[in-house]
């Protein structure tokens, strides 16, 4: 009988897995033809939109202005340069960064991987040629896909589309030094799906046509290239194997390597084979390369080596303390004999809840209530890419143009942490073969050919570096880009100043308070949580000072930091407009008061012996508007506090489809909302496609995703403020390279669903917002813009003719001022008055009434 039950259970699991895989297979990547056609339709419809003249104001911030992925500097006048932002477009300065102009913000792609400029002596910026490769290659959660290559011959006033639509992510554009019609492009390819359009592409007619000259396989593309300027037929290309899904990321593979061409990129040969001195095999990750142009025989390469790091040092072991490893395979008998004082110290050092001490744990293990492995299991994460026992960043040098390689760094370089896939760049001085710059979380410089490195990121800089230009005439002068924007040094990194005039913040979530004037709060990618006045003027978006009497009051910035890390969601208690709930990645939140130092850490944990909780990168939180003492928090379960996030209680079981094996936390709650009409009417959405409703404050939940597309990321659940049973959801296929716009509405608490917005372009949706005053008006933010419906979702129109093309991650309506606040992931915060929208709506509604009465 037991054997029969086991077979039945196994068969059931097999059927469920088959169903799951079949459903997943139905979520197919959107092909380029459909995508480009949709973009053209979008442009056409935007011209006729009733809302085409709606104006917006940008309020910043600028001091933390987003991820810069590439910089191109005029070698004849270094005060002029271009800065390419991951999702904020291309910007141009002629005054060393004091001010910038956006020159790539209305094209069919907003995200940039690399740029190249055909600089000419004595040329004006109106005559030079600029190339833009769209689609960031850093392969993070928000590395959006592009649509190919663009070119401008008039400094960005007009752009010509050059093709490569399935490239998605472009790592490098190399221009021939003397023939402006020849260029090479390193195409990394799709991030979330296999595809053939990867490798190296070459054009000999200025981009009118392309030839794929290096192709490896459907998961391996080219991420980096360099050229011998003395002999332009000699090129190098770095290939990189990487695959990603919503629950897993593999950033290494045996097809990662360096290729060389001796005939202008027409044919290629692998120069990092086994025996070359360069790492090979499944542990090789992202690679960067640099040619020393004064002597092109000298090459440098940086590699993310994921091979295990063997610790051969003779470190003195601290026997006065326990380590995590001590508990890995510990027996019951061994644990019960541990020193209580040392065990208590270990529990304190590792942030175990206060309710656990040595005596209580030993008693629970002795009674078999807990397993001996419970301590180790509680500490070690099942998910996440947290393997620090790898070699990581390594520097290699070749003195024979790639025939052989030698590792030159004598000590481990700790700049990659666990995410070397996010970096992979190396530079060599144009004049000094031994001066090498590379980076990861820090920017590092070597003066001895890569043997030793020194971190030189000082005050006024930001972490996570991605690009650097070295002045060919003065190699102590660098212009570098990182997750916080651009930094400039004139003394090899001893002192830096920060470029702070670009509103390119990458917001995840935003909210407002009810102060007068009201403030806007938001969490930014790798830039923490900030608050700024909704009345911030364009000239005061960054390090411009607030209007104060400077003789009697200290200077203040218009935007202020209220939290670090990757800023996520924010909630404000509008009873005082001072109590703030904010946090960072994977659910580490806090409650703080802006007027004092009162602070409460918020991060619910599982108990010893329980299955670990799972937290989304952007873990959702919610403050009830019915009673702002009530606070909700979503892991894979719902947690609630009745007293301002203190004493959080777990109310639900796992509301997702369950844990899925992989290196990325998955099976997590992504959205929480409460009905504005009924206290305790809650909805949640998950990253694996579940939508659940509770009508009793979170104690009991019902799955209500019948009839919806399966397994899609639920980006937003929004309960209606007009009808109690109405709820709206947006589903997002970005993590399948599917760009469909999915939005659904239910009138019966999710029992049945109806798809709306079927005329929306092929752009993944992030947020839907009801207009609180007019029931028929809906606002939707996508990965490419803002749309509005006047008929409860039957049809939508563009509302972003005066916005740049940029992902819109969040929308908030400040009801007192009747303003729509737009949180973008690349161009900071925009605000518009809704009075004009309402006026247009009423005009349309009155015309329809008149026509009906005739």
Show the residue positions of the predicted features:
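Bacterial Sec-dependent N-terminal signal peptides
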Residues: 1-29
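Beta-propeller blade termini and top-face loops
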Residues: 26-850
């Amino acid at each position: 009988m037991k054997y029969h039950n086991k077979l039945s259970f196994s068969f059931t699991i097999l059927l469920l897995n088959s169903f799951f895989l079949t459903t997943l297979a139905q979520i197919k990547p959107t092909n380029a033809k459909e995508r480009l056609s949709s973009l053209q339709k979008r442009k056409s419809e935007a011209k006729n939109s009733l809302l085409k003249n709606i104006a917006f104001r940008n309020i910043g911030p600028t001091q933390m202005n987003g991820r810069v992925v590439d910089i191109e500097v005029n070698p004849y006048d270094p005060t002029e340069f271009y800065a390419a932002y991951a999702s904020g477009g291309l910007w141009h300065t002629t005054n060393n960064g004091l001010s910038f102009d956006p020159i790539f913000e209305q094209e069919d792609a907003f995200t940039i991987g690399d740029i190249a400029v055909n600089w000419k002596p004595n040329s004006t910026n109106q005559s030079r040629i600029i190339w833009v490769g769209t689609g960031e290659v850093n392969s993070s959660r928000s590395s959006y896909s592009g649509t190919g290559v663009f070119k401008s011959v008039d400094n960005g006033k007009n752009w010509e589309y050059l093709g490569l639509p399935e490239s998605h992510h472009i790592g490098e554009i190399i221009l021939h030094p003397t023939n402006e019609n020849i260029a090479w492009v390193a195409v990394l390819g799709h991030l979330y799906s296999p595809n053939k359009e990867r490798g190296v592409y070459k054009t000999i007619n200025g981009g009118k046509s392309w030839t794929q000259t290096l192709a490896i396989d459907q998961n391996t593309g080219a991420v980096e290239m360099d050229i011998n300027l003395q002999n332009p037929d000699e090129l190098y290309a770095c290939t990189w194997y990487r695959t990603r899904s919503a629950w897993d990321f593999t950033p290494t593979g045996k097809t990662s390597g360096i290729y060389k061409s001796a005939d202008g990129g027409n044919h290629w040969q692998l120069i990092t084979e086994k025996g070359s001195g360069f790492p090979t095999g499944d542990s090789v990750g992202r690679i960067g390369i640099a040619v020393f142009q004064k002597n092109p025989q000298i090459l440098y390469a940086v590699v993310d080596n994921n091979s295990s790091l063997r610790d051969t040092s003779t470190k003195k072991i601290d026997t006065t303390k326990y380590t995590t490893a001590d508990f890995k395979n510990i027996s019951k008998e061994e644990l019960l004999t541990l020193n209580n004082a040392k065990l208590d110290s270990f529990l304190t050092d590792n942030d175990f809840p206060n309710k656990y001490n040595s005596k209580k744990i030993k008693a629970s293990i002795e009674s078999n209530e807990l397993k001996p492995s419970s301590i180790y299991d509680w500490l070690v994460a099942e998910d996440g890419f947290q393997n620090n026992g790898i070699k990581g960043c390594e520097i290699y040098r070749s003195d024979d143009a790639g025939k052989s390689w030698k590792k030159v760094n004598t000590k481990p370089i700790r700049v990659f942490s666990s995410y070397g896939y996010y970096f992979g760049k190396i530079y060599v001085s144009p004049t000094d073969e031994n001066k090498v710059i590379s980076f990861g979380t820090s920017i590092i410089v070597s003066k001895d050919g890569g043997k030793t490195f020194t971190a030189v990121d000082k005050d006024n800089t930001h972490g996570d570096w991605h690009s650097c230009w070295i002045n060919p005439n003065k190699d102590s002068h660098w212009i570098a880009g990182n997750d916080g924007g651009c930094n400039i040094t004139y003394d090899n990194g001893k002192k830096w100043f920060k470029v702070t005039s670009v509103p390119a913040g990458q917001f995840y979530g935003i909210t407002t308070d009810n102060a007068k004037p009201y403030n806007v709060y938001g969490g930014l990618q790798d830039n923490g949580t900030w608050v700024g006045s909704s009345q911030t003027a364009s000239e005061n978006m960054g390090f411009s000072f607030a209007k104060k009497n400077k003789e009697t009051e200290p200077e203040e910035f218009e935007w202020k930091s209220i939290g670090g890390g990757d800023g996520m969601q924010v909630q404000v208690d509008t009873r005082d407009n001072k109590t703030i709930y904010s946090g960072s990645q994977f659910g580490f939140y806090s409650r703080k008061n802006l007027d004092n130092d009162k602070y409460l850490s918020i991060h619910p944990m599982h108990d010893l012996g329980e299955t670990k909780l799972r937290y989304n990168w952007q873990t959702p939180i919610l403050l009830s508007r019915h009673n702002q003492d009530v606070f909700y928090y979503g892991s894979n379960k719902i947690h609630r506090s009745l007293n301002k996030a203190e004493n959080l209680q777990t109310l639900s079981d796992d509301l997702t489809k369950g844990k899925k094996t992989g290196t990325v936390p998955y099976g997590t709650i992504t959205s929480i909302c409460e009905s504005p009409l009924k206290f305790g009417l809650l909805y949640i959405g998950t990253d694996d496609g579940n939508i659940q409703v509770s009508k009793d404050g979170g104690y009991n939940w019902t799955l209500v995703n019948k009839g919806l597309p399966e397994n899609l990321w639920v980006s937003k659940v929004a309960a209606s403020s007009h009808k109690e049973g109405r709820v709206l959801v947006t589903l997002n296929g970005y993590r399948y390279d599917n760009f469909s716009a999915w939005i659904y509405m239910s009138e019966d608490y999710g029992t049945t669903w109806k798809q709306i917005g079927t005329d929306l372009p092929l752009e993944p949706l992030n947020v839907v917002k009801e207009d609180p005053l007019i029931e028929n008006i809906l606002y939707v933010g996508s990965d490419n813009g803002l749309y509005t419906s006047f008929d409860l979702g039957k049809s939508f129109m563009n509302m972003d003719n005066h916005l740049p093309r940029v992902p819109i991650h969040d929308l908030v309506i400040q009801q007192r001022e009747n303003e729509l606040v737009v949180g973008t992931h690349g161009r900071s915060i925009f605000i518009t008055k809704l009075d004009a929208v309402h006026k247009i709506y009423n005009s349309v509604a009155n015309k329809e009434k008149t026509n009906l009465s005739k």
